[in-house]
Swiss-Prot record:
Location relative to the cell: Cytoplasm
Species of provenance: Escherichia coli (strain 55989 / EAEC)
Chain positions recorded as substrate binding sites: M35, R77, L115, E156
Enzyme class: lyase
Family per similarity comment: Belongs to the UbiC family.
Source taxonomy: Bacteria, Pseudomonadati, Pseudomonadota, Gammaproteobacteria, Enterobacterales
Name of the molecule in the record: Chorismate pyruvate-lyase
């Protein structure tokens, strides 16, 4: 099962450097805190619509593979993050199987809990980078995050209803 927003997310093309953009746009794209929290600050009720979740092999993550350790399996989670029921963001998280140990096993059990609610309560969360991407007029971003030093890759596409636009 897929969704057109996830297809467009995978089509994002990333800038080699952070482009010169309007400050309001950069404020959204370079946000280091939780996007869930930012959406809630807009006075919205945030919910997750699950598109896909489960283990995948390398051939299903060609865009992410160069940015993660080479392993036999990865945990993939694809969602729509909705504000008052309206999709504002498509998200794709790829987690190497080696990251799924200790407390990080919880990444497999998030269900309809927004990823940000888990990640940004962890004292061990660090971010290696944020890349800005664009496709067909929509903006997105990709971050390699680490929990207790263990990597995961999060890609987000801001959908047309998002306040980023």
């Amino acid at each position: 099962m897929s969704h057109p927003a996830l297809t467009q997310l995978r089509a994002l093309r990333y800038f080699k450097e952070i482009p010169a953009l309007e400050p309001q746009l950069l404020d959204w794209l370079l946000l280091e805190d939780s996007m869930t929290k930012r959406f809630e600050q807009q006075g919205k009720t945030v919910s997750v619509t699950m598109i896909r979740e489960g283990f995948v092999e390398q051939n299903e993550i060609p865009e992410e593979l160069p940015l993660l350790p080479k392993e036999s399996r990865y945990w993939l989670r694809e969602i729509l993050l909705c504000a008052d029921g309206e999709p504002w963001l498509a998200g794709r998280t790829v987690v190497p199987v080696s990251t799924l140990s200790g407390p990080e096993l919880a990444l497999q059990k998030l269900g309809k809990t927004p990823l940000g609610r888990y990640l940004f309560t962890s004292s061990t969360l660090t971010r290696d980078f944020i890349e800005i991407g664009r496709d067909a007029g929509l903006w997105g971003r990709r971050s390699r995050l680490r929990l207790s030093g263990k990597p995961l890759l999060l890609t987000e596409l801001f959908l047309p209803a998002s306040p980023l636009y």
